[in-house]
Amino acid sequence: MDDRPIVFFDIAIGGQLAGRVAFRLYSDLVPKTAENFRALCTGEKGLGQSGKPLWYKGSAFHRVIKGFMCQGGDFTAGNGTGGESIYGEKFEDEGFPVHHSRPFLLSMANAGPNTNGSQFFITVSATPHLDGKHVVFGEVIKGRSVVRTIENNPATNGDVPKEPVVIADCGQLSSDDPFLAERTSTDGDPYEDYPDDEDQELGNPETVLQIAKTIREVANRLYKQGDISGALQKYSKSIRYLDVHQELPENSPPDLNEQYKSLLAPLLLNSALAAIRIEPHSAANAMNAVANTSRALNRLELSNADKAKAYYRRGLAKTIMRDEVGAEQDLKTANELLPEDGAIAAELAKIIQKKKEQREREKKAYKKMFA
């Protein structure tokens, strides 16, 4: 198994590097399929029949279904209708020695029997209904959190990621590459990015609460150090752990529910703040901020000060999303809750002035039309 080839993807989401994923390929079980993927990672085969490089670099994940899989590899059309193998357009199913029994397996996408090209998918859960239909040819050995980030990136109704998920770079790694070395936590957070991948038993809500608190402390420290992007990742992670127990068991201690809520409120508000502070602004981060502030407002009992924070931050996020009407409504509500806050008043004045200038431009345009 040590001589199984290892390849990597460097993933960018919305133009920002999300991290590296490394795969070990089952060259001993399905050598032809594994070699196809390996060569498409290195780009060593040059141009294909389509006239485009036989290379995954620059191609995108065009289909992502949360709880199921992340699909990519169409470097010719980019939408799931194209792709090409190193052997020609299509090649046969080599065999089905490995079942889709767990997350983080690499499998060939196809259009029916013996139609393998370059498209692949990464499982994010067990998918036994695909056994005998799709060839499993590898597994993720590093970067599981990056795969989860792809999975949880917002998608359209057609399962297309709203923010492009691109293979910014790819290639082959030696078995002694530093990226593959075991890493210990250097920031005080030893936990997996997603609870489903955590080895520790999470059935006890008090255990999960303590994990979430630990991660929040790391997030706060990163924020104070100016690592806003890192802080957002940790705030989001802490929320994911709390969400393991959205409904607490009936026999839970009486104050445990309050402890959960008192931790969740600042996590939601702080994650929103971090999301709108990251430069350059992105629609994905703005949507994150809107979702978390809305959750805090709709599901938690907040003080007036925290309500004002939530409306203010949601208003800023809506401004980033160019939803000026929604932004003005939220900023007005925040201003009513906290009229002495200068920052809220300034943002509200700014958006009102912008609306006034827009009306003036429209008036001038109409005058020119009928002059």
Swiss-Prot record:
GO biological process, one term: protein folding
GO cellular component term of the entry, any: intracellular membrane-bounded organelle
Keyword Repeat: yes
Gene3D superfamilies (UniProt xref): Cyclophilin-like (2.40.100.10), Tetratricopeptide repeat domain (1.25.40.10)
EC number: 5.2.1.8
Hydrolase recorded as keyword: no
Protein name: Peptidyl-prolyl cis-trans isomerase D
